[in-house]
């Protein structure tokens, strides 16, 4: 029987040898006849269909097998179970994966970590994968595109395993590595691999290497690679050229590269010219930049908004107002819409060259592109630069727009009018803003209140405050604080107290600034005792006085020659951890000097120096008076110079 089996398998081998397959497969034979003695038999074997192959004879990947393997790996909850199921599945079919199929499975896995684990398993599933560079290329590419924090170390580990296993990569391996690594050391390692694997760099390899050096900002090596590309007769695409030009923007070498593009018949696009225009501007060659612009037009190219802005930035740097306006006019003619940055370049140029009167012409040129947003930007910018009349004129143009206005532009105009002292215009504007669909808010009212208070226009404050309470919006804590300070500034103490009491009855509650304003109002108008009462009141309400509170009240006591009270407040603020500033020391020094307490004033000055405060001009004025007293010099006492030392809380 053993002999029969041996003869049977020998006959099977004889039958199948001409079409031997490279993959382990089970064969089923059907016995068709046997000898009477049973010592020989005939069997019929049905060979499986051969694997489909491409035109070169390489087997095509079996898609159903790839999908099944991918589903087994990704569908399992446990990784070890997934790989075990895959191994069992392949064993049940007596199949092995081809390297291409393993590569496709790697590509189908959506997790880089899962791909790495499968890559480790591939040698046991695919006997011919050990020396396949394409499989290594696939896993390196997957890692290079991942966000794994240790992806660089993982790729280096794979390269080490390739070296140890004597696996030679191909030029695609090097290209992937160059595109992945970013530092010079790793790039040098890639070049060593080229020599080790006896590879020849192609145009794409040189392009990858050039871009890698540019990304790592190693511009000298990048230019060396470019020179090698020229010597080798390799070609670069427009993207690589533009990237190199942008990197060499501050270098004369950019001009050489630009000329090489023409010699090598690489068509220069609008981005190329934009880069070169910026380069000429950086090295101060404005005329050459204009020449490039004209050359670009001759070649039928059109700049986009970035290109036009770049050219106008160069012209602004060269103070070429006429040329900048000409370029702006052409920009509009070609249908390129200017943006805020375009207008900012022209506006700053006109302001710097004292030709702001030409702004109306610029606006007229781009009339069809003027929007509410552009008007708003110009109004805000002119207001910040202090050109109130021009801002107001543009604002009037903006007012004619039928669309809803922007709050920021109206706010900027209000601030400009108030800053220029045009409070009547500001009040009128405040009353008409709602016509443009902009709701007047508390900040707008506060801006106008603050300007009226500084100009002591109390009658307008009364009227506007009544209108605010009647029509809205509701006053906030800042409104009340501004009003208290404004009434105190003109000596209307009763009105300031009324506002403070109204604040207490409102939803807003007085804060430290409210009390500081009221204390300053009371003290400066002679009611020091009431100011002191308010000081105690704020402490009872849980508000901690700050340095402004103490300084204000100390100044009030100093003016009424109540030195002990002033000094007591100074000691109290130190105990409570409130650090005095230079204004506090100046007030107390002046108080002590005026009352002849020279020794205490000198001691106080020493404390001030120990605290690390720097004396100012007022400090030195008081010290000069102290020195003149110590030398017995007679002098005429001038008007109290301390008035106004304490800055308004607002």
Swiss-Prot record:
GO biological process, one term: RNA splicing
Record-level GO cellular component terms: mitochondrion
Organelle transit peptide residues: 1-23
Annotated PPR repeat ranges: 132-169, 170-200, 202-236, 237-267, 269-303, 304-338, 339-369, 371-405, 406-440, 441-475, 476-510, 511-545, 546-580, 581-615
Domain of life: Eukaryota
Cellular location(s): Mitochondrion
Record has Cell division as a keyword: no
InterPro entries: Pentatricopeptide_rpt (IPR002885), TPR-like_helical_dom_sf (IPR011990)
The UniProt record lists the keyword Methyltransferase: no
Keywords, sorted A to Z: Mitochondrion, Repeat, Transit peptide
Family: Belongs to the PPR family. P subfamily.
Protein name: Pentatricopeptide repeat-containing protein At1g51965, mitochondrial
Organism the protein comes from: Arabidopsis thaliana (Mouse-ear cress)
